[in-house]
Amino acid sequence: MNVNKKQESIPVNTGSESISSNDNERFEQGKGVGSNLGSHFFEPVEYYYSDGKPMNQTEASQMKGTFSRDFSLNEMNNEFITDSFFCTTTPDPKTESPSFVKYNAHCDDHPEISGHVSSNDKDFAYFEDKSENQPLVTLPNENNQVIEPLSSQSCKSQLSTQNYSESDFGWNQLCDLDPIFKSLAFTDDTNLFPAFADSEAALIMLKKREMTRVKHRAGRPRKYSYVNKDLNFEEGLPRRRGRPTGWRKYPEKEEIYPTLSPRIKKPRKVFDAVVIPVTIKPSIYTEPSLPHHIDWNNGCSEEFDFEPSREDEDFPDLTSDSTGQDPLSSEPTIFDISPLPSDMEPTFSENSLITINKMAIEERKQSRRLEQPLAESQHQEDLLNPYGVDQDFDETCINESEQQATHIPNSSIKFNYDYTPPKSATSHKHKRVDLLASRKENVWTGLYGKVQTEMVSNRGEAVLNENNSKNRTNVTKPNSYKNSVLSIGNNHSNHSNIIKPNTYKNTILSNENNTPNYSNVCLSTSLINRSLPSLKSTMHPGVNKDLITRPFKNVNKMSVRKALIKPFHPPISKISRTRLTVSSPERLYCAKPISMATAPSETDSKLINRIRNLELEIGGLKEQLSVVELALDTDKNSKQIQVVERKIQNWRKSAQLAVEVLFPVFSLKFTTMLQEVPQSVLRTSANDLRTKPCSIGTYLEQLQIPFHLLQYNSETESWDLE
């Protein structure tokens, strides 16, 4: 610590005491007053009266006054902090006003910081910083009262204990100049600064925090868009009203909808997803390549249905040690298909088939009673059953099939492995109105004679055929003939799971060699129409022959015929005469071929020859016409070519004129540039370009314009005028 002289204490808070003799000696010597605060000291420089008149050292030495200072060094930031410094003196006997002394503040540790104490007001003395020329602290100085300098920690407590009037403290100046008072101005204790709210500093600070409120006119408030400036507002279109599209009313509510993601079955091992197995479980097999035989003579086909492979079933035989073919190899994969074990073969009997059909009939009857009211049901009964056939005829058919099932061999039964019994009664509900439209495809006849049964299922089919006449029996039930014969008119039954008897001649459904024959799902109407006349002749004498009708009733026959014929018109039956000149005349639409009755006569031959000659003349005239049209087109094209050539000449002249105007400017610039280019860059061509004057050809070459386009002759360096 640098100390100039012996450190002596300076009296503080003693306004009546004067400066000690040692201090006065130092003032007189001009060496300043030492301090016990370390290297901080003040050196008196000049002495003034309050009116600005300087005083000499003798007069200054006789002055009695006290001064106080508080300089501290911030150890944390190593910054020089000056809380306050002020000096008061006794009043001058001449002017009766307190005089003051101007000091310079020095700091050995921080030489860049310096200041001086001065006053231009008799009530205040303050410390100025030379760097900013802005007073830091302003404290009252009234009645020669010396106030101990206040630190930032003790300022609030000392201000609260002492009673100062508003005039004594310059609150506006204090808040604007001292950061200590600024921090105190925002404390909870508002009674300390009663006049702070009216100060200018308070207004400045309040403007930053003030909420600007817009007063609207009375009435309906304006609806502003979420966009500050509407894009369509400048175009004169009306502003958008309400919420923009895509904006929710309550955006803070995040609605999370649970999504059902499909379960991904991960492979248990890596090889489950990569290796192709060689052996497969016996129960899983693919469809073999069996021949698909079609019997064209009988109009029937053999179909083989096999169960598809079950994809949901795992492969327990597939392990990490399994060996398989490389997926990237081009060789075909070979699968070993083991035969189907005996315990897994489907078992199906006639009794189970009949039981299933009985259940389906009961479910159908029950659903029909619950589905339609009585009046509607009766109305549909009259429409669909005009002959009054008993609705329970299906049970009769089942009873007949029970008697015949024992005589049918199992070898003629064909099964589908996909067949499953009906799930519920709802799967068999069919509206009776829909059955009316499909009765053409379901014609069941129950005539006496040889009986053949057929069952058709939605999932599978079992065709029951009789191969020889020994296994066929005649039905002798007394009431069965009525229901079976009248079932031709009752075409409303559309149950595919029900066995229904069909009686036709053996030649219709089976061939003479007694080979197994598999019929289609539904009999074609043409087959039934051909068999109806023979059926009427071999019918029982007690049967009413008028009841046997075609697949659709006579009532609808004419309407159907009209509907089919209405959109078509009969073609013209005569042949166009122009076609007679051809050696092989073509038929026009459905016209009849030329016969002897319609052969052309001698009179017609003259007309034909004349027509032929006229056609030749017309052909020659057409050729001449085509030549004339070609000549006209050529003339037109020549005129168009002339127009295009004229436009090209006009453009060429304008381009030549533009080159002549721009060439002098280019040549001057180009020549100037060539003078600056060194010979090493252009080598041999540099001298030639310097010596040879720039021409229009060089200008066109720089622009990459061909000479022939503007008809420029490089030899004569001129335009070729045509």
UniProtKB/Swiss-Prot annotation:
- What processes does the entry annotate via GO biological process terms? DNA recombination; donor selection; gene conversion at mating-type locus
Q: Where is the composition biased (Acidic residues)?
A: 302-316
Q: Does the keyword Cell cycle apply?
A: yes
Record's compositionally biased regions (Polar residues): 9-22, 319-332
Using the UniProt annotation, give all residue ranges assigned to the region (Disordered).
Answer: 1-35, 301-342
Q: What keywords does the record list, in alphabetical order?
A: Cell cycle
Q: Tell me which PANTHER family the record gives.
A: MATING-TYPE SWITCHING PROTEIN SWI2, MATING-TYPE SWITCHING PROTEIN SWI2-RELATED
Q: What does this protein do?
A: Required for normal mating-type switching.
Subunit-level organization: Interacts with swi5 and rhp51.
UniProt name for this protein: Mating-type switching protein swi2
Organism of origin? Schizosaccharomyces pombe (strain 972 / ATCC 24843)
- Encoding gene, per UniProt annotation: swi2
